Amino acid sequence: MSLKEKTQSLFANAFGYPATHTIQAPGRVNLIGEHTDYNDGFVLPCAIDYQTVISCAPRDDRKVRVMAADYENQLDEFSLDAPIVAHENYQWANYVRGVVKHLQLRNNSFGGVDMVISGNVPQGAGLSSSASLEVAVGTVLQQLYHLPLDGAQIALNGQEAENQFVGCNCGIMDQLISALGKKDHALLIDCRSLGTKAVSMPKGVAVVIINSNFKRTLVGSEYNTRREQCETGARFFQQPALRDVTIEEFNAVAHELDPIVAKHVRHILTENARTVEAASALEQGDLKRMGELMAESHASMRDDFEITVPQIDTLVEIVKAVIGDKGGVRMTGGGFGGCIVALIPEELVPAVQQAVAEQYEAKTGIKETFYVCKPSQGAGQC
């Protein structure tokens, strides 16, 4: 049974009438451009065919009823006429409440709604299950009540909800790609202007995501440290963000910076340049060059930005040994564990899967999780 069928059937059973709409919003993977988003730089993600699906209908009153199919059909109810505060017990409900609350601040011309939510974006894998939920809820209200909001506004609303209501400090990339993703394309995003450019993906290439299943422990504290060091670097160059510093300017005075800060700044500058070039390589179908850029990105994250772990490096090496120069592989996400992403000709996927199954657990003691994805369409009706 598809997520659409599941949520529609649950909706009819729970609420006693049929849903009028079913909306989906996808998760995402970032192909290249790591830690560049909060430096006003460039990222190159694609939406994936794992999504949050919501069957829904408008109500003729001011009540919101939400059922979470993936959490034993827990039900949350709240009113649009009372202050929206955090739910004491259901963390999932706070993503919904946060989106609704922040949407009221943007455009309060919507009424009540019934929703049943289900999703298959793996949680805790860095594939943006939370952003896909936020964008799905925003799209539900936009579609049901014909709100004059575009995908970028729905994305910004989701980011605000996560930052201010849920209390997690994320960039804009995850929500933006979920809202604006395009089938068979990646999206080059300028994180300063929020401008986007669709980049066609070569035919016959699979997007493979492999979760190392190494439990991330350092990610919060180390992420914040990296962010502060990048801000220190921007101040040193008297620029608003590292996006405004050229590699030539950096090389001329790198010796004056703290050596650790200098290495971390260098990663951001080189990664921005790689990301822009990667968009061109992909568009031209040059998988060999894309692979080189992904390899350089991984080396930079490992040696300059220092955010990989041995388990991730091992996974990358296993995949690289199989694909050679026919594709690319690198760590993706915040670092200190999580996933790797690989662009692989479809005919090589079984060989990669076999090599990883045979070697990764033997070398690390951890069993990986393997996902084969397609670049998918952003949020909308399904």
Curated annotation (Swiss-Prot):
<keyword id="KW-0479">Metal-binding</keyword>
<feature type="binding site">
    <location>
        <begin position="34"/>
        <end position="37"/>
    </location>
    <ligand>
        <name>substrate</name>
    </ligand>
</feature>
<dbReference type="GO" id="GO:0006012">
    <property type="term" value="P:galactose metabolic process"/>
</dbReference>
<keyword id="KW-0808">Transferase</keyword>
<dbReference type="InterPro" id="IPR036554">
    <property type="entry name" value="GHMP_kinase_C_sf"/>
</dbReference>
<comment type="pathway">
    <text>Carbohydrate metabolism; galactose metabolism.</text>
</comment>
<protein>
    <recommendedName>
        <fullName>Galactokinase</fullName>
        <ecNumber>2.7.1.6</ecNumber>
    </recommendedName>
</protein>
<dbReference type="InterPro" id="IPR006203">
    <property type="entry name" value="GHMP_knse_ATP-bd_CS"/>
</dbReference>
<dbReference type="GO" id="GO:0004335">
    <property type="term" value="F:galactokinase activity"/>
</dbReference>
<keyword id="KW-0418">Kinase</keyword>
<dbReference type="InterPro" id="IPR006206">
    <property type="entry name" value="Mevalonate/galactokinase"/>
</dbReference>
<feature type="binding site">
    <location>
        <position position="223"/>
    </location>
    <ligand>
        <name>substrate</name>
    </ligand>
</feature>
<dbReference type="GO" id="GO:0005524">
    <property type="term" value="F:ATP binding"/>
</dbReference>
<dbReference type="Pfam" id="PF10509">
    <property type="entry name" value="GalKase_gal_bdg"/>
</dbReference>
<dbReference type="InterPro" id="IPR019539">
    <property type="entry name" value="GalKase_N"/>
</dbReference>
<dbReference type="InterPro" id="IPR020568">
    <property type="entry name" value="Ribosomal_Su5_D2-typ_SF"/>
</dbReference>
<dbReference type="InterPro" id="IPR014721">
    <property type="entry name" value="Ribsml_uS5_D2-typ_fold_subgr"/>
</dbReference>
<keyword id="KW-0299">Galactose metabolism</keyword>
<feature type="site" description="Transition state stabilizer">
    <location>
        <position position="28"/>
    </location>
</feature>
<dbReference type="Pfam" id="PF00288">
    <property type="entry name" value="GHMP_kinases_N"/>
</dbReference>
<keyword id="KW-0460">Magnesium</keyword>
<feature type="active site" description="Proton acceptor">
    <location>
        <position position="174"/>
    </location>
</feature>
<comment type="function">
    <text>Catalyzes the transfer of the gamma-phosphate of ATP to D-galactose to form alpha-D-galactose-1-phosphate (Gal-1-P).</text>
</comment>
<feature type="binding site">
    <location>
        <position position="162"/>
    </location>
    <ligand>
        <name>Mg(2+)</name>
    </ligand>
</feature>
<dbReference type="InterPro" id="IPR013750">
    <property type="entry name" value="GHMP_kinase_C_dom"/>
</dbReference>
<dbReference type="GO" id="GO:0000287">
    <property type="term" value="F:magnesium ion binding"/>
</dbReference>
<keyword id="KW-0547">Nucleotide-binding</keyword>
<keyword id="KW-0963">Cytoplasm</keyword>
<feature type="binding site">
    <location>
        <begin position="124"/>
        <end position="130"/>
    </location>
    <ligand>
        <name>ATP</name>
    </ligand>
</feature>
<keyword id="KW-0067">ATP-binding</keyword>
<dbReference type="InterPro" id="IPR000705">
    <property type="entry name" value="Galactokinase"/>
</dbReference>
<dbReference type="InterPro" id="IPR006204">
    <property type="entry name" value="GHMP_kinase_N_dom"/>
</dbReference>
<dbReference type="InterPro" id="IPR019741">
    <property type="entry name" value="Galactokinase_CS"/>
</dbReference>
<feature type="binding site">
    <location>
        <position position="130"/>
    </location>
    <ligand>
        <name>Mg(2+)</name>
    </ligand>
</feature>
<keyword id="KW-0119">Carbohydrate metabolism</keyword>
<dbReference type="GO" id="GO:0005829">
    <property type="term" value="C:cytosol"/>
</dbReference>
<dbReference type="Pfam" id="PF08544">
    <property type="entry name" value="GHMP_kinases_C"/>
</dbReference>
<dbReference type="InterPro" id="IPR022963">
    <property type="entry name" value="Galactokinase_bac"/>
</dbReference>
<comment type="similarity">
    <text>Belongs to the GHMP kinase family. GalK subfamily.</text>
</comment>
